[in-house]
Amino acid sequence: LCAENGMERAVLARELSIKDIKTICSNTDTEIEVFIHGALCVCYSGQCLMSSLIGGRSGNRGRCAQPCRLPYKLTDKNGRDMLAGTDAGQYLLSPKDLNTLEILPQLIDAGVTSYKIEGRMKRPEYVAVVVDAYRRAIDSYLAGNYNVPQQDFENIEQIFNRDFTTAYMVSRPGRTMMSDRRPNNRGVMVGRVVKLFKGENKAAIKLEKKLSLGDGLEFWVKVGGRVGTTVNKMTQNGQEVTSALPGTQVVIDIPNGVRMNDRVFRTFDAELMAYAGKFYGEKAKRRITVDAVVTAKLGQPLTVLLTDDEGSTGFGETNFITETARKHALDEAAVRKQVDRLGTTEYVL
């Protein structure tokens, strides 16, 4: 009915399986769009009113305050904690993030037209890294050689993750879909504390991944949760270095509370952020060449016709008529200077 009234594309709910999606695609001419990456809602799509009731912000209007990321207890009618003594975390309503890189070919084969990446309230570097990886993956499949470089998997994990799941795409995962121990970015494990320097607030870290100056770290301490720091200085064998490779040890400054054998997670990757920064901003903006035809005839409005490389056009005219100049007549240089004032748009004359 919607298609008969002009709807061209439908966005499917996240609760559908690939089999469901394929069935829908094969029974409609409407373009189908699906979510392929990012945050998941613990409720059926459109059915959660928690944010509206708790925070006065409607999730159905794109303003969800994510109360599902808060800690909760599961109690019986007598107030008894039903999960006491189990391995369940306290973030009982917090799902992992959706990641479909490994099953993307199945979605393409199912007939999906558009692939939706959840990025509400995310930083631009997140958008850049995730779109970069999925664009490359889709292009490789269409070229007949599907391949996702290991670096793309690592970049997506590093930029933001609550651990990953394919949600309902392949199966009904139950509790394994939940990130009940951590509701926000968990980062990537880069090493362990192997030595503490008493009285110096320094530690030696045995690295499992490359570490660079500017990286943000979290120590998952045995007592007190997590403490963080930024790597502003690190040494190897007494010499200052700007980066260090997996398998080596570095000495860095640490916050209070760090213990031996604590795991070290990187939550901010300075090199990855610099890479992502190349995808946006003025230097990275796509430039579209346009031709301009300016026409001025006495007694008529001055008109401007713009045409880009793909043949798209834009037309405008003044609300005054052209008159004979009293002092300085317009010449080509003056007209070009004015037309070339395209500001921060992506167009260039």
Spans of model-derived segments:
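Surface-exposed amphipathic alpha-helical tracts and adjacent flexible/coil segments at the periphery
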Residues: A3-L349
